[in-house]
Amino acid sequence: MTTETFDGVRLTTKANVYFDGKCVSHSFTLPDGTKKSVGVVLPATLTFGTAAAEIMECVGGSCEYKLDGTDEWKTSGAGDSFQVPANSKFDIRVTEAYHYICHYA
C-alpha cells in the first residue's frame, strides 16, 4: 500500500538537493515528532549514506537498489519498501523518476 498523504505536518520549504539535482527532497515532521522526507530521484546510479536507519517507500516509478555488503540488486516499485540499516549505505539505480518517502527509524 502506498502512502498518499500526511496530515498536520511541519514542512521544511527549502529543498534538500543532492548529486547535482538528481535527488531532491523535502523534510517534514509529524505532530508526534516523527521525521520523514519525501522526494524524487531522477535517472542515475547513486550511492547514499545513512546516519539513522531508513525505510524507503516507493510511491511512484521504480528503482533497483543494493544494500552495503551485498552484490544483489533488488527492484522496488510503487507500494514496495526496503530497509537500510543505520550508519550504512546503499546504491540506487533509477531509469525513470523514482518518487519516495523516507521513514527514519
Swiss-Prot record:
**One MF term from GO for this chain?**
guanosine phosphorylase activity
Q: Does the keyword Lyase apply?
A: no
Query: So where does this one cross the membrane?
Result: none
Q: Name one GO cellular component term.
A: cytosol
| Keyword field contains Transmembrane | no
Gene3D superfamilies documented for this protein: Jelly Rolls (2.60.120.10)
- The signal peptide here is none
Ordered alphabetically, the record's keywords are: Glycosyltransferase, Transferase
Its domain of life reads Bacteria
Please give the catalytic activity noted in the UniProt record. a purine D-ribonucleoside + phosphate = a purine nucleobase + alpha-D-ribose 1-phosphate; adenosine + phosphate = alpha-D-ribose 1-phosphate + adenine; cytidine + phosphate = cytosine + alpha-D-ribose 1-phosphate; guanosine + phosphate = alpha-D-ribose 1-phosphate + guanine
Tell me any Pfam family this protein matches: Ppnp
SUPFAM superfamilies per UniProt: RmlC-like cupins (SSF51182)
Q: What does this protein do?
A: Catalyzes the phosphorolysis of diverse nucleosides, yielding D-ribose 1-phosphate and the respective free bases. Can use uridine, adenosine, guanosine, cytidine, thymidine, inosine and xanthosine as substrates. Also catalyzes the reverse reactions.
Q: Return the similarity comment.
A: Belongs to the nucleoside phosphorylase PpnP family.
| Alphabetized PANTHER family for the sequence | PYRIMIDINE/PURINE NUCLEOSIDE PHOSPHORYLASE, PYRIMIDINE_PURINE NUCLEOSIDE PHOSPHORYLASE
Which protein are we looking at? Answer: Pyrimidine/purine nucleoside phosphorylase
Give the taxonomic lineage as stored in the record. Bacteria, Pseudomonadati, Pseudomonadota, Betaproteobacteria, Burkholderiales
